Amino acid sequence: MDLDEAFLYIGEFGCCQKRLTAFLTLLQVYVACQSMLIVLVGAVPEYLIDNEDISASKEEYTKHLHDTNNFTSIVSEWHLIKNEAYKVNLASSLFFAGLLIGNILFGPLSDKLGRRPVYLSGLFFDITFGYCTALAPSYEVFAVSRFFVGIMNGGMALVSFVLTQEYVGKSYWALTGSLTNLIFAVGIAFYALLGFYIRNWRTLAFVANSPGIFFFLLSFLLPESPRWLYSHGYTTEAEGVLQSMAVGNGVERPVVKLKSCPGTSSKSAHSVFDLVKYGVLRWRTILLMYIWYVCSLVYYGLTLNAGELKGNLYLNVALYGLVEVPAFPLCLYFIEKSWSGRRKATAGFLGFAGFACIFTIFLPETNGDLLNPTVLALFGKLSVSAAFNVVYIYTSELYPTVVRNAGLGVCAMACRFGGILSPFIPTMKSLNPSMPFVAFGISGISAGILSLLLPETRNKPIAESIEDLQSPAYQLLSRGNEVLAST
């Protein structure tokens, strides 16, 4: 039997896989806390300077500065105000730069060395640098530690997402992918709750990082991905993992015998360069990189430019996460419908987000409560969050197992560029106040249109090797499944 048949035999989403999925999705709470750390740790407290005529030196400001808040942050500890205020954004940018590097490094590494060892290494160093952040004696150490947390957090989260997918049968990839992103959104709200009760930034950073130890110790119980083992020629080891899953799923006396995977006899190792070498992968990668880039650009663009949320800091952070929650059931509904699927759902959600940006141009200066820039931002963010969720699942299905993490890593790299560039788009306001929203809108709509050039993956078999994509048997099976699903 091949791997998809083996999953049907042992159970695509049995008790064993449910436990593995629950563990890896709960890990996203830790990932979210690390990702959102700077929002509260770098919050600017209200302060008074009793003598505005003093010199602009940091030492003089310190003497005349009075904090009026009941929380601490790196701003209050190291007096990052006035000429030093840029350092908060710099630390945030360093974290995103780390995410960029982590996505580039960890994808190919896990495709070559295996999912499990790369995931465990990333989580270990993520925890280590997380404690360096909490105990940083100076801003410089804090900023550098955030950079390395970004590398480890981004890379480890990418590999854990792929593991979540590869532990289950293909028909459950949409569910497990959506659960991963849903728990990340809930994790943002959980971090806001932590911040509400823990007002000292060092204690908050320490507590937010500590659950990582629990996840790290339990992660040693995780098996290697059977899909990675099978695609790299470790057929016996893959059979062993699948038989253990079968026992955990309650299958009596399971016997799993896999046939050889096409393409594993090749002596050359697969790498990120395969994404350029093969035409079918090259064009998919170009399209997906642009779509991921736009998802990030529009996501952060709507957040930063469609009106600032007023009110309680902790409530706003919680809303920032919770507004994404409805996106996931919407995503699950649309991607499993024959008239929508992955491709049209991606196009629709991106198009909606793009039109939300364009529509902002026509809002009057004084808006009612029902329709204003903040409400439009929340609806747009809901839509682009759904697009992000679909794209994660869609990308996993478009790449063969041997280069799946490399493909996801390259796409995630493009995503980080979108996040880094989005704050600079508002400078276009100097040309015309509507220009930033026009840029975001055109980007979203264009990405939605281009996504229609990608093949649909709903109810199609997962390619294990690059040769599968070019195999007539694979293409025939794909068409057969598509016809069967439409009847």
Curated annotation (Swiss-Prot):
Its main location: membrane. The gene is slc22a15b. It comes from Xenopus tropicalis (Western clawed frog). It is found in: Membrane. Disulfide bonds: none annotated. Probably transports organic cations. PANTHER family: SOLUTE CARRIER FAMILY 22 MEMBER (PTHR24064). One of its GO terms (molecular function) is transmembrane transporter activity. This is Solute carrier family 22 member 15-like. Belongs to the major facilitator (TC 2.A.1) superfamily. Organic cation transporter (TC 2.A.1.19) family. Glycans are attached at residue 70. It is a multi-pass membrane protein. Keywords: Glycoprotein, Ion transport, Membrane, Transmembrane, Transmembrane helix, Transport. The chain crosses the membrane at residues 22-42, 90-110, 117-137, 141-161, 178-198, 203-223, 286-306, 315-335, 345-365, 374-394, 406-426, 435-455. GO terms for biological process: monoatomic ion transport. The keyword Acetylation does not apply. GO terms for cellular component: membrane. Pfam families: Sugar_tr.
